[in-house]
Amino acid sequence: EERRAKRSPLRDVAGMLRSFDYAALDALRDVATTADEWAALAPLAREWAQQSRGAFLQGYADRAKGTPLAGALEPGRGLLGLFELEKALYELRYELKNRPDWVRIPLQGILGVVG
């Protein structure tokens, strides 16, 4: 029954946007072994995530031209922002339960939407 329920494709877009943040910070965790390395590389990881999010949204917007989704692809705003927040809150709950040392990733996502 749940599979047949209509879902907004913006939920999937929000999930993809969140995955870029995870990929960037997971890669950073793999290479930054000291606080100095973290401080030096964190801005690059954030920039990569932002560039990737932007490229994904641009490609999606190009394909969505002429559809109701075309005007709803501004990250952190409207329905897409709500779905991003929903996904980040779900991630926070998951990480607190299973991987507390990863909590930084969803917290940054939450702050990015509400801040």
Task: Please provide the spans of the model-predicted regions.
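Short secondary-structure subsegments characteristic of cysteine-rich extracellular domains
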Residues: 45-48, 78, 103-115
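All-alpha amphipathic helical-bundle segments outside canonical DNA-binding/catalytic cores
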Residues: 69-83
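Active-site activation/catalytic loop segments of kinase-like enzymes and analogous catalytic loops
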Residues: 1-64, 85-100
